[in-house]
Amino acid sequence: MTALALSRIHFPITTLGPGKRVGVWFQGCSIRCPGCVSMDTWAAGKGMTTVADVLDTLAPVVSSADGLTISGGEPFEQSEALAALLRGWHRLGGGDVLVYSGRALEDLARALSELDGLIDAVIADPFLRAVPQTVALRGSDNQRLVTLTTRGVELFSAYEAPLPVGERALDVLFDDNTGDAFLVGIPRPGDMVKLAAALKAAGHSAAATEDVR
Ligand code: SF4
C-alpha cells in the first residue's frame, strides 16, 4: 500500500489544462518559492492517505473527466506515490496528464524518464515572483511547459501562447463538509491579496497565502 500525503482533490477544474479535469494537490513542498500562492501545501506529513484510497475517490469521475492535473506541493518529492497514482489513473482509463513541478526541468530528467508515457506534459521550474506572468498555465514566465507524448503535443502546444487579456479565469470550488471555498487557477499578481481584503471587508473570514507581487 503506497502512502501519499494529499492536500486536496477537486473535480471539475477548468483552469489548469484543457477541458474538465480532476485536480490532485500533493501535500509537502521543500522548495519554498517566495510569493507562492499555495503555502498551505508546504508542510510535510499532513493529509496522509494511500494511493489506493485516492484512486477509489477518482474512479467514479474518471469517465467524466478529460484529464488529470497534479500539482502541489511538490509531486516529485513523493515520487513513489506519484508513479503509483499515474499508473492507477491510466488503469482506470483516465485521460491526459499534466504535472506541475517547482524543480528545474534538468533535475526532473531522470524521474521523467522513469515515468515515460505516464505524463503528457509537465510544467517545470520554480515560481519566481519578480518575473512577469503573461503565458498560460504558468505562475511566472520562466516556468517551462514540456510536452512528453504525442497527445501532449496535440493538447498543450496551444498553451505556449500569451494569455489574452480578459481570458484569465479562476475556478471557485466549495467543500460541502467544511464550507471552505478554494480558488483554482493562475491568479494575476496581487489578485489573492485583493480578494482576501474584499471578502474581509464584506464580513467573511478570508486568508490568502503570501502573494506580494
Ligand atoms: S510555487 Fe510550487 S514549488 Fe514553489 S513553493 Fe509553491 S508549491 Fe512549492
Where are the language model's segments positioned?
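Charged phosphate-binding loop/patch that engages nucleotide di/tri-phosphates or the phosphate backbone
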Residues: 165-213
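Receiver (REC) domain switch/active-site residues of two-component response regulators
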Residues: 120
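P-loop/Walker A phosphate-binding loop and immediately adjacent motor/lid segment at beta-alpha junctions
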Residues: 78-87, 132-179
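Conserved Radical SAM active-site core
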Residues: 2-7, 20, 38-99, 103-114
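Short secondary-structure boundary segments
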Residues: 101-102, 125-127
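Short beta-strand/turn micro-motifs composed of small residues
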Residues: 101, 149, 185
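N-terminal [4Fe-4S]-dependent radical SAM core
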Residues: 1-25, 30, 34, 38-44, ...
